[in-house]
């Protein structure tokens, strides 16, 4: 990474990034992508509550993420930790602790993250090859008592 040729033009990054968002929210979504040096930059200012992240051109596969703007402090901290090579459960532990300590603001209401993955983005067609869309619904400060959801996955209790 680091060469301008490695980074797709802003319009291509935007077209791919917004595909993770619900169709009715795509046009007004803010988009964070990559500049010529491979650093994260704002490609488009948002007009609604969605923020979308363009796929990292340094990675072999495609992934775009879109989420409610109230999740941005939490997501930005996750990107900072990844840059520091803090990954997996350790990254989640750090962020969750910082939320509990009030260091990272977190929405009080549920918010959704949309993640679209695939083998590649075809700029000419605007389609993601071998695509898969998943949702993550963040329910901050929820407990088993407030949601009825277990604290462990089913495999660990069956």
Located regions from the model:
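Extracellular structured ligand-interaction cores
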Residues: 47-49, 132-136
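Conserved small/polar residues in nucleotide/adenosyl-binding loops
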Residues: 157
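Pocket-edge structural micro-motifs
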Residues: 33-35, 54, 116-118, 139-141
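N-terminal secretory signal peptides
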Residues: 3-93
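Short, surface-exposed ligand- or partner-binding patches at beta-edge/loop junctions that are enriched
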Residues: 152
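Substrate-binding/catalytic groove segments of enzymes
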Residues: 144-148
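Mature extracytoplasmic domains of secretory-pathway proteins
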Residues: 61, 69-134
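Helix N-cap / beta->alpha transition motif
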Residues: 67-68, 138-140
């Amino acid at each position: 990474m680091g060469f301008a040729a490695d980074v797709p033009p802003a319009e291509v990054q935007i077209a791919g990034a917004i595909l993770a968002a619900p169709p009715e929210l795509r046009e007004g979504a803010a988009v964070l992508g990559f500049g010529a040096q491979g650093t994260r930059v704002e490609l488009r200012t948002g007009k609604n509550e969605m923020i979308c992240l363009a796929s990292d051109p340094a990675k072999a596969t495609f992934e775009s993420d879109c989420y409610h703007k109230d999740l941005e402090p939490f997501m930005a901290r996750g990107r900072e930790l990844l840059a520091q090579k803090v990954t997996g459960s350790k990254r989640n532990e750090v962020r969750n602790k910082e939320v509990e300590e009030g260091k990272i603001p977190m929405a009080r209401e549920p918010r959704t993250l949309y993640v679209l993955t695939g083998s590649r983005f075809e700029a000419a067609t605007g389609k993601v090859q071998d695509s898969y869309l998943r949702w993550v619904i963040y329910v901050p400060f929820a407990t088993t008592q407030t949601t009825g959801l277990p604290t462990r996955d089913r495999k660990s209790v069956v």
